[in-house]
Amino acid sequence: EPYRRQRQMCIRDRYINSIKNVKILPYIYNMEEMMNISDLLVCRSGAMTITEISIVGKPAIFIPLPSMSANRQEDNALVLKKIGAAKIILNKDVTGQKLSEEIDDIILDSLELEEMGKIANTIAPSNVEEKIYQEIKEVVK
């Protein structure tokens, strides 16, 4: 926990004065709201996170959770990386410097930032609400 807090403070100090409206948070309870107002997401890459990011159309830097079984999060992150909507930093390679460089590469290039978000949105599942509604209707019958 102290290491995590120290990293958070280091990142905050680097960006707090150079980029407007930066928020560095240890945990987010209102994820949907934060995703919608964010320009760039730095996060793990679980299947739901990938889906949510594609729906809101945001660029991302993924730090996949290392796994003993098949590196699922890394595979998930590769889906968006391969189409140009995300970057990946493996957990074993994460440093403040590396993360800072990746953030700078994206956030300081407004065209890349916008393009990555648009690309992410191209793989968003469509008609999700309708599909859920139809499934519920089938179950209730």
Where are these regions (language model features)?
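Short hydrophobic beta-strand element within catalytic cores of glycosyltransferases
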Residues: 43, 50, 59-70
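Conserved donor-binding/catalytic loop of nucleotide-activated donor transferases
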Residues: 36-38, 54-63
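Acidic donor-binding loop of glycosyltransferase active sites
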Residues: 28, 36-51
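Single conserved hydrophobic/aromatic residue that forms the stacking wall/gate
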Residues: 1-13
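C-terminal alpha-helical cap of glycosyltransferases
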Residues: 125-141
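A short, well-ordered alpha-helix in the C-terminal region of glycosyltransferases
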Residues: 105, 112-126
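Nucleotide-activated donor-binding/catalytic signature segment of Leloir-type glycosyltransferases, i.e.
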Residues: 12-26
